[in-house]
Amino acid sequence: MTQLSLKKIYSGKVRDLYEIDDKRMLMVATDRLSAFDVILDDPIPRKGEILTQISNFWFNQLAHIMPNHFTGDTVYDVLPKEEADKVKDRAVVCKRLTPIKIESIVRGYLTGSGLKDYQKTGTICGLALPEGLVEASKLPEPIFTPSSKAEVGDHDVNISYAECEQLIGPELAAQVKEKAIALYQAAAEYALSKGIIICDTKFEFGLDENGTLTLMDEVLTPDSSRFWSVETYREGINPPSFDKQFIRDWLETSGWNKQPPAPKVPAEVIEKTVNKYQEALDLLTK
């Protein structure tokens, strides 16, 4: 990654944050990929640029629902030209917010950890669901299933809505739930018109200096969401998706124990993953 003259204040699984001043920071999406909470050694070329374009598209598309972390500044306003040229497609200037300490997950379809919970208990995060649902079943309505935020390298844990209220307070929990579902519904309706089913997604929210709930980080990318193609979707099977599921599936069959270090990912698996990300961008924004 490019060295920047700004001070790096945080390095996450995929994004690095740099300090601009006490109100703003620069968020740079790298080509790193994490799977099963382990950062893989092999970067995915152009992934950071594609994620940034998809996220920026959704921030603008959903701006009528709630405020977001954009400041209106460009990278050229905060970096020397030669640095800005290198990161312009993968970096955004954003507000410094106080992050809300939960992952706001909305599910419209049943799969993944939600399906496992449902098969055991008939519920997800304490929410009772109808009987007879199977892999990839559409849920009667989108559900808010929060999880606790883990440190880098730890696993997020699904929590009930009551636990969510305890963590962030009942008033904020109600606001987060309402906004998360509204964002999902608007995005899912739009994506469907482009041939994409948004199975589930994770939103990140923060509070600005006035306490206003603000959408932040990344929005509805293949890293934070499961996208399925309308053409290959059918109930009862796990549909192929436009995201890192392709690499996750390869890792599942590689015999890896899911502890660092991760195995080396073959070039063709990396290439197919890049193509999946690019296809999602093309479909959504065409």
Curated annotation (Swiss-Prot):
Keyword flag ATP-binding: yes
Keyword Nucleotide-binding among record annotations: yes
GO biological process, one term: 'de novo' IMP biosynthetic process
Key words, A-Z: ATP-binding, Ligase, Nucleotide-binding, Purine biosynthesis
Gene Ontology MF term list: ATP binding; phosphoribosylaminoimidazolesuccinocarboxamide synthase activity
SUPFAM superfamilies membership: SAICAR synthase-like
Catalysed reactions, as listed in the record: 5-amino-1-(5-phospho-D-ribosyl)imidazole-4-carboxylate + L-aspartate + ATP = (2S)-2-[5-amino-1-(5-phospho-beta-D-ribosyl)imidazole-4-carboxamido]succinate + ADP + phosphate + 2 H(+)
GO CC, alphabetical: cytoplasm
Family per similarity comment: Belongs to the SAICAR synthetase family.
Protein name: Phosphoribosylaminoimidazole-succinocarboxamide synthase
